[in-house]
């Protein structure tokens, strides 16, 4: 019998001073059985950095031809495609062809730097692509089935906290 996904309720109170975006998002987010708590939190962090009304989680790990987070227009065009990890150029190229803007977030420092050294030249041709490295150690301590997070962004840095923990999260732009 297959293990089912864990369903997490996530309340995000976002104050993004860089974009002048102030909103609360009440989300229901599935965590795939093979997904680590740390990777799940990377998805939440990426959502926070890009938060807006029509941003949504997709089926993610289960579907090859969709990103993990996206924003679609009213005419069903993919305006923003967000993916994670050390992706191959083929997937990135496909995403850049289907979406107006593509963001790839990497999060394992050693692996991310090696991957970027190998991919940087190949990926320069994609003008609608941005690649970032998220430095967010121990954020998996925040995970619970019902999360309520305070999210403050200023000068590109995220201050993420719940009732018991707080973390400074930085994002480094690769491309």
Residue ranges and their predicted role:
Residues 69-71, 76-92:
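Conserved catalytic cores of phosphodiester-cleaving nucleases, focusing on short active-site segments
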Residues 56-64, 70-74:
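Long amphipathic N-terminal alpha/beta scaffold segment
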Residues 91-95, 118:
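A short acidic, amphipathic alpha-helical/loop segment
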Residues 16-61:
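Acidic-basic catalytic patches of nuclease active cores, encompassing PD-(D/E)XK
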Residues 52, 97, 124-126:
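Short, well-ordered coil/turn elements that cap or connect secondary structure elements
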Residues 99-101:
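Short glycine-/polar-rich loops that comprise or flank the Walker A/P-loop
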Residues 2-32, 103-107, 111-174:
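Helix-rich interaction surfaces within compact, conserved domain-sized segments
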